[in-house]
């Protein structure tokens, strides 16, 4: 089930954010994610976030900022079970177009977004990490 993020969800959602980023981005030092943990928690409280619950446990979430996808995050043990797709489809139902940034070294995420209809528009550089990324977009047809 997908529902709107509630304030009480913050610890579980922030933990999923941290764990997922460390595992998915092994080319970025874990300390980078840990050092941003507190500010991300604060930002999540103000953001448009939808959580996916299974058996009353939050297993994933998606963050939106207008048409920008801040991220799709699924807890490690629940990955590759369609939860990311469900969350992304939920966002697609709410927007006519979406865009996001994804690290070029994150081949798994790039493949996922391509399967879901996103296209690479151009490449750039994440100045905070020094890593190259892609801007990908999706548009309702």
What are these regions (language model features)?
Residues 48-60:
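Conserved beta-hairpin
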Residues 39-51, 68:
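A short helix-loop-beta-strand connector motif used in the catalytic cores of GNAT acetyltransferases and
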Residues 68-79, 102-103:
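A short, internal acetyl-CoA/4′-phosphopantetheine-binding micro-motif in the GNAT/acyltransferase core
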Residues 1-15:
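A short beta-loop-alpha structural element at the N-terminal edge
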Residues 80-93, 111, 115:
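Conserved acetyl-CoA-binding loop-helix of GNAT-fold acetyltransferases
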Residues 15-41:
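Conserved GNAT-fold acetyl-CoA-binding loop/helix
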